[in-house]
Amino acid sequence: MALELLSPAGSPEALRAAVQSGCGAVYLGWGSFNARRSAKNFSDEEFADAIRYCHLRGVRVFLTLNTLLTDRELPLALDAARTACRLGVDSVLVQDWGLFALLREALPDLPLHASTQMSVFTAGGANEVYGDGCERVVIARECSREDTAAICKACPAEIEIFGHGALCMCYSGQCEMSALIGGRSGNRGTCAQPCRLPYGFNGPAKNTYPLSLKDSCLADRISDMERMDVSCLKLEGRMKRPEYVAVITDIYARLLREGRKPTAAEKADLELAFSRSGFTADYWQGRHGPAMFGTRPENTPEPKELFAAARAKYEKDDARTVPIHFSCSCQAGQPVSLTVWDDDGHVAAAEGPIPEPAQNKALTATDLEFRLQKTGGTAFRCTDGSADVADGLFLSAGAVNALRRDALAALENARCAVPVRREQDFSPLPNLDCTADTPTLTVSVTTWAQAEALLPLAPARIDLPLELLAERDALPDFAGEWCAILPRVWRDRNEPQLRTWLAHAKKLGVTSALAGNIGHLPLLRDAGLTIRGDFGLNVFNSRSLDYLRRKELSSACLSFELRFPQMRDIQKLIPAEAIVYGRLPLMITENCLVQNETGCHLSEAGDAVPQQAPCRKPNDLQDRTGAKFPLLPAYGHRTEIQNSTPVWLADKPEWKHCGLTYARLRFTTEAPAECADIFRAYQTGAPASGPFTRGLYYRGVD
């Protein structure tokens, strides 16, 4: 299958720019449930017109419904998908597990694409969503050429990659920085882009931007994608100007069409259209580091000449035409007939009046062919045609024009015909109730010293990183449950090591594991451990819990973007958990922020982070207000950024009345004795003794 070029359409004008510049498909937002709610997006009428405009010109339309949804919003999102399906949309991109399951049942013939917000970066994850009905998977921007090739080889789904545009610092779908700092959720389409602000490393914020990545540009790596059977190359930019969309689409379309790399002039135009101190292709090449980062000054001038030329081209609306062919018969005593067809198998026909005997000059085949070839003002371009005209006949110019107009209108309708798709009722949620009267306290730790300090207090469960468990030959005596925390991010090449560690953990007496990614599930099924869903799965509604129940999870942690009433109203189809104490994770990043500052090379020795690594020492980022965000090392020499202050709810009653089975205390930077004190405070309901936040449990997110 040829590599599809997918362009952003943040507005009707941007859509026209993309189509006229040569894209194969567009993705757009309609309604409130898309990950770029700040884009202009489309009204109801504009959305219907957009689908017809695109389909007429052979361009597919993908609707983004890729945000997390509450129980109250799910029916509205389903209605939007039903309407889009009836209008002929070609696919819907989804993030929310509940909406995914709902759409697959209610609209079984509607193609679904797994949005990059599903955080898929392994073949196991891709196969999980493919097996549940996603025909295409948009993999993480951080995937390298080798990662992508492994996924393409091992998964039958179509694989889509980001080829050009902005790079988020955090793995998409896992970023909570905008939500927790300002209440604007990236998972709900309102990210405030705090990654573009200045931060200081272990000191006050200066004019440094350690979270601001350059835009990606893979224009000269297209042949790589084609060799490994990538299905779609996606251009990012629904928030950008239509002229920007036109420029980048035109260049990438040319490269695909001509099978070549970009010229120096084309690279310059891409950079002129928009860049942040240049471009990067480091993720694709399996690299990371300081060279990937850049900024764009606010006073950067607009490329007026480049944009004016692009605008002039797409405003003519005639660059993208459909080649057609015709055959006409004009015989005495019979209505004149015209058949037109395109190269995609669509055929249409029209009839005109019976030709009259010629009084003066008779109609010739050459004359009729010349008139029928005039398709100006339409989306069609006649490449060839023939007319069979009997001698001595006359047909008025008006009749010929009407005949051509009717035939082209019929062909347009054929090209824009809406496919017949089934619409079904969806099943009610099962009559299950795992609501608990009072939650039991569980703990997660990052060090053995923390775990040992908590053992005498008898939490119901202790969650430890799998890497820590791999270091031990035996576990301390503990009446509760030992639970392994799998790395939040890993790659297919890491799975042999993870499987070895899981087998070792099971021998030690570990009985369960936290799955924070859909790709964890095949690993944990094979390991024979009880699977508990972690916060990375973004459980936001009852249908998501039901989806995970059917995936045989024994419990799941609810999203910490939910307010307590929303948490309470979720039907507990499996035991539910919430994080009620701790520094909440803001980001998980492919770049090691400490390595970028110190020049450490320990990543060359393997993916496990050694104890002597500089990232094991206390490090933080400091913003302009003086808030300090601790940096913790993550498997694969990645970084997890923690919130500046911990959530404290020991003195609040609401979390005890949400039907939760488990309430988790998440320990990260705390000293062992501090962990024990905090656990006791939650047993007694004590107030906080230091700075704290209530998280989003009261204020919620936009």
Regions found by a protein language model. Name each.
Residues 1-21, 25-36, 50-51, 57-67, ...:
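Surface-exposed amphipathic alpha-helical tracts and adjacent flexible/coil segments at the periphery
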Residues 39:
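A short acidic, glycine-rich active-site loop
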Residues 42-47:
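Glycine-rich, highly charged phosphate/nucleotide-binding loops
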Residues 90-91, 99, 108-112, 120-124:
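N-terminal glycine-rich cofactor-binding segment that shapes the pocket for flavin-like pterin cofactors
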